[in-house]
């Protein structure tokens, strides 16, 4: 499928060590999912990458239903990863990345902070909730949610 933006490609969203290990074909197979991945990338991830100034690594992007349901993943049946509306971005300092996304006013649906990555989702064509959530495993600093700092 090729390039989405100057720093992201569809293959990055399809790449999955878990899928490879268990012989699961994890390929974006519908235009609807492809368009959702494109929208997430162009509206949230590429602007974040531009502001961050360093590469962003996708740990988990698109997940076919079989991969999402695999015990090694344990994804929710309603996961936005299945729809192409979510990506988990590796971060040595997840709160710094999340704070930047918040301060930029990026139109995310959910931003969930984990110890080693940040989950970003964006509902294709839908209203975005702008939720900042923390996985129970995350014990670090919290995002400063100040409306004066948020541009969006």
Give the positions of each predicted feature:
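N-terminal start-of-chain detector that recognizes signal peptides
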Residues: 31, 59-63, 91-95
């Amino acid at each position: 499928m090729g390039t989405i933006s100057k720093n992201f490609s569809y293959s990055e969203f399809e790449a999955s060590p878990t899928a490879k290990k268990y012989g699961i074909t994890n390929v974006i197979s519908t235009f609807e999912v492809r368009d959702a991945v494109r929208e997430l990338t162009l509206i949230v991830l590429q602007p974040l990458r531009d502001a961050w100034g360093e590469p962003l690594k996708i740990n988990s992007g698109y997940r076919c239903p079989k991969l999402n349901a695999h015990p090694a993943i344990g994804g929710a049946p309603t996961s936005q990863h299945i729809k192409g509306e979510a990506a988990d971005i590796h971060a040595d300092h997840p709160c710094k990345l999340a704070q930047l996304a918040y301060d930029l006013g990026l139109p995310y649906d959910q931003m969930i902070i984990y110890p080693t990555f940040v989950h970003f989702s964006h509902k294709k064509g839908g209203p975005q909730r702008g939720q900042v959530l923390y996985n129970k495993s995350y014990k670090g600093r919290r995002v400063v949610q100040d409306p004066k700092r948020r541009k969006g």
